[in-house]
Amino acid sequence: MLAGPGGAPFCGAYTNSVKGDIQAVGEPLGIDFEENNRAGVITLNRPSRLNALSREMFDALSEHYQRWAPSPHIYGVVMQSSHPSVFSSGGDLKTLHAWSEQGALGAIREFYRAAYSHVWLLEKFIRPNVPLINGLVLGGGIGITLYGTHCVAGEGYRLAMPQVGIGFFPDIGGTYFLSRLEAHTGLYLALTGRAIGPADAYRLHLISHYVPAAHFHVIKDALSDNHPIDRLLDGLHRDPGEGELARLTPAINRIFGMSSVEEILDRLDAESGEDEAWAKGTAAEIRTKSPTSLKVAFAQLRRGKTLSLADALRLEYRLASHLIARADYGEGVSSRIAGKGREPRWHPAILAEVDEAKIESLFMPPVDGELELDERRGETSISPRQLTET
């Protein structure tokens, strides 16, 4: 089974409530933090923005995980969403768009630095860490859920990495986990941005358990009461059935194993038989994406196969630092904010015009320095013995 860092799949009454943090004057942070007996409870609570993640939200998440790691009161952490159908829509594009319009590239870089640093902190956090996802989870939302000890999906779960559609690339650890998915499925998801449900996510080991959302409260109660979480989750887990990608796996493996994006598109265009309609639709979808981002994602996942998570995050910070200064990033974010009917105008507009040397330069260290990650153990983790003795 494909596992994330640390071997996990990709994915006395002590009460204290910490709410009302302020992100800006008059604007709530968008996350509620609560300590309910032995559980740290995180609720994404920014429904008007579909739980889009801001720099302040990443900082607050990191602060609380660092606070809870050594706490003798906390057995584990559970994360949930207040929105009925969205867990998180990813990064806060409205704020990123405003910064891009202002030329505030330093602020954008710090946003991505905070996001990638939080992913690394989660990799080092060994207490039970259980996101409960029963809705759409995109981009940055995947980054705050995939690297825990467990990842629980309900029937409403949908996951997608749509970043190439905004002139960016599949980040937040995508270099690491997408490159390790079976049968070139990671590249397929990266280039198309298509969403998958719980059945495909379970087969690809992007979630650890499929549990009907009606039982999520049982999981929260168990963490609060210090009950062993693995046995409980295994008992609640249900067979999610066969996913949409299962039948397509041979075609994905055959087509997306080609040596360039252009060759992939040629194979999709030439496909016939039972997969012809899927292939034509997939090719059309890919051609709506930023040509530069398509090339970046292809090269990124090729490199990611041999990288550790830490090195993958460092590579992503390099890419982010360079891409935010390019026209496609501002154009892509702007078109997404504008909504349907506003098609992005990519520069260059077609794959044939993308300069391969410029793609290679995007992987070079940024002028503001590399992403610094502490790879020592112990700062945000405790031993299994401590977990059983507290």
What are these regions (language model features)?
Residues 175-184:
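Hydrophobic, secondary-structure "cap" segments at the distal end of domains
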Residues 122-166, 189, 193-194, 198:
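Glycine-rich beta-to-alpha active-site loop
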Residues 268-277, 286-387:
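Long, low-complexity C-terminal extensions of enzymes
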Residues 148-171, 203-220:
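Gly/Pro- and small hydrophobic-enriched strand-loop and loop-to-helix capping segments
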Residues 7-8, 16-80, 120, 380-390:
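Conserved CoA-thioester-binding segment of acyl-CoA-metabolizing enzymes
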Residues 42-45, 60-102, 117-132, 154-157:
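A structural preference for short, pocket-lining loop segments at secondary-structure junctions
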Residues 206, 211-289:
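Amphipathic alpha-helical blocks and their helix-capping loop/short-beta junctions
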